[in-house]
Amino acid sequence: MNTMNTALQIRIISAVLAIIALTAWPTTATAPYTAIIMESGSPYFVPKSATVSTGAPIRWENPTPTEHTATHVGCLEDGESCAFDTGIVLPNNTFTLPGLAPGRYPYVCRIHPIMHGVIIVTDPAATPSHL
C-alpha cells in the first residue's frame, strides 16, 4: 500500500511539474501593429487615417515598385517637432515605428508629396470607462 501511495504521489508531482513547465515556456509573440500600405494610386496610404493607442507599433508596408517615405510634417517645417521619418522605404520593404505619444500626426511622402495621411494616437487610460 505504501508503494502505491508513493507511485501515485510521484505521478501527481510529475503532472504538476509538467503543467508548470508548459505554462512557463517563453513565447515569441510580438505586439500587434497597425499596418499602413503605401499604394501607387489614390488614396496612396491605406488607411489614409489610422487611429492607434499610445505606444502601439505602426508599420508602413511598400508593395509598390517605387521608393516612398512617411515623414511627419513637423520634420519639414522650421521650429516644429519631428515625430518620425521612415527614411526611404524601398520596394517590398517595411518600416515599423515603435509607437507615438497621444496626438495627431499628419505625414507625407517626401518623394511624392501628393501622398499624405494622418495618424491619430489616443490614450485609452485617459478615456473614462462606462459601467
Describe these PLM feature segments:
Residues 9, 24-131:
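Extracytoplasmic copper-binding redox domains, predominantly the cupredoxin/blue-copper superfamily
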Residues 14-24:
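Bacterial N-terminal signal peptides
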Residues 1-4, 29:
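Universal eukaryotic N-terminal targeting presequences
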